[in-house]
């Protein structure tokens, strides 16, 4: 990765201090696959070093057996980590340790595949081997180190693609090929366009495109895994994309920075816990769906575009010790369909709304249990069920008639908020 603009670069520098603040999280207590406690884990397997013992990350994951530890170097890898039906054993997990590595989802554009159709306007008819509406809705370019969405985000508002004649230097657009894109198929065909100042070389614009869908991806039946000390940035989908039926999976000290969709997202019947998460500049900070069961502790979320916290369907979710700097369209939404029931526990959570007020939403068929919750510059709308213990919602004490102090703000800000964001929490 060439660079990540301030304040994002500060997040990486914050790693050393952040690692020292993370506490152990009790297991979820899910039925089925047993969950190992930290003192029950056996460290007796092999050490597999990517680049030495295995040529690639995927080769290392494939060869890892219960008790083995995969090691990355603290460098940038233009690669991803995919776990597909990977299982350790109770007390002998497969450990994937990034040691501060970054999984970069974007690649510099191939200049030979972009043709100049008029001065400063470049076109590419085949940027990806396959394109559909889901990918296009998440799409962005990294332009001289900065993420360029053109006012579009996957789970939020999407500005119409600009017409070619309206495109300004530093902007991009997409034009659908209606003859090739058939209504019966989800596949899209068309042309991406990049606009730079006439006379400037395309190479000088320093543009990258997201060529991988995720930083870390789980699919199928995975069990007894520990994934830690890793940053995912610039995939067109999720930083950490968790599908399938995983059990006894732990993420420790992970970061999702500027991802096209969710920082981290659980799907289907996934069960995992996260002990230390930084999620910045994504479409959503956390989005968990279907029947997943997840637990997050020691979390910082900021500068997301659509949702900061989005919990859906029939899942059971918990968030503890968290700070959110909310600039998104929706700070907190808990939602379920008529035949579903979603539940969320919040404990010691601070959400500060930065600008335009937008309420937290507990929709019908949703249950919120909140303890030591503080919401600042925002209200809460409850259409489902909500219970409160020692909470402050925009200065209002909940439950009513009981003195409340809310989240432990001083401790949360000191321990979880990167230095680049500290000043935002010193303001009233």
Question: For the regions a protein language model found, what residue spans apply to each?
Answer:
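Residues at the C-termini of beta-strands that transition into short coil/loop
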Residues: 99-100, 107, 268, 283, ...
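Extracellular beta-rich repeat passengers
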Residues: 206, 222, 229, 234, ...
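Bacterial N-terminal signal peptides that target proteins for export
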Residues: 1-11
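Extracellular beta-strand/beta-solenoid scaffold signature
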Residues: 83, 112-125, 180-182, 209-217, ...
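Bacterial N-terminal signal peptides
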Residues: 9-20
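Extracellular polysaccharide-degrading/modifying enzymes targeting complex plant/algal/animal polysaccharides
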Residues: 26-234, 241, 411-427
């Amino acid at each position: 990765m060439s660079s990540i603009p301030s304040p994002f670069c500060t997040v990486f520098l914050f790693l050393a201090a952040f690692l020292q603040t993370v506490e152990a999280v009790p297991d979820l207590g899910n039925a089925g696959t047993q969950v190992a406690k930290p003192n029950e884990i056996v460290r007796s397997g092999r050490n597999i070093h990517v680049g030495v013992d295995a040529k690639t990350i995927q080769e290392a994951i494939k060869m890892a057996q219960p008790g083995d530890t995969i090691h990355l170097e603290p460098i940038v890898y233009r690669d991803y980590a995919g776990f597909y039906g990977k299982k350790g054993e109770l007390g002998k997990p497969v450990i994937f340790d990034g040691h501060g590595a970054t999984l970069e989802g974007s690649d510099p554009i191939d200049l030979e595949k972009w043709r100049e159709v008029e001065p400063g306007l470049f076109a590419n008819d085949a940027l990806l081997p396959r394109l559909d509406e889901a990918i296009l809705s998440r799409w962005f370019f990294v332009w001289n180190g900065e993420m360029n969405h053109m006012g579009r985000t996957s789970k939020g508002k999407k500005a119409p693609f600009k017409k070619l004649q309206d495109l300004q230097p530093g902007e991009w657009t997409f034009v659908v090929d209606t003859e090739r894109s058939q209504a019966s198929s989800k596949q899209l065909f068309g042309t991406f366009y990049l606009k730079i100042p006439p006379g400037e070389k395309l190479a000088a614009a320093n543009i990258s495109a997201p060529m991988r869908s995720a930083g870390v991806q789980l699919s199928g039946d995975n069990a007894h895994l520990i994934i830690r000390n890793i940053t995912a940035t610039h995939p067109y989908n999720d930083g950490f994309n968790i599908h399938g039926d995983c059990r006894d999976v732990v993420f420790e000290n992970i970061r999702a920075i500027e991802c096209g969709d969710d920082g981290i997202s659980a799907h289907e019947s996934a069960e995992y816990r996260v002990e230390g998460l930084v999620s910045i500049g994504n479409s959503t900070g956390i989005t968990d769906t279907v029947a997943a069961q997840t637990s997050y502790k020691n979390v910082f979320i900021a500068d997301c575009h659509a949702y900061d916290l989005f919990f859906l369907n029939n899942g059971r979710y918990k968030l503890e010790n968290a700070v959110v700097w909310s600039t998104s369209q929706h700070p907190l939404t808990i939602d379920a369909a008529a035949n579903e029931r979603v539940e969320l526990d919040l404990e010691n959570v601070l959400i500060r709304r930065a600008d335009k007020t937008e309420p937290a939403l507990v929709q019908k068929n949703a249950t919120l249990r909140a303890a030591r919750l503080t919401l600042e510059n925002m209200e809460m709308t409850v259409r489902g069920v909500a219970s409160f213990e020692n909470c402050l919602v925009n200065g209002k004490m909940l439950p009513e008639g009981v003195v409340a102090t809310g989240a432990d703000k001083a401790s949360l800000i000191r321990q979880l908020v990167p230095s680049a964001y500290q000043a935002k929490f010193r303001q009233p």
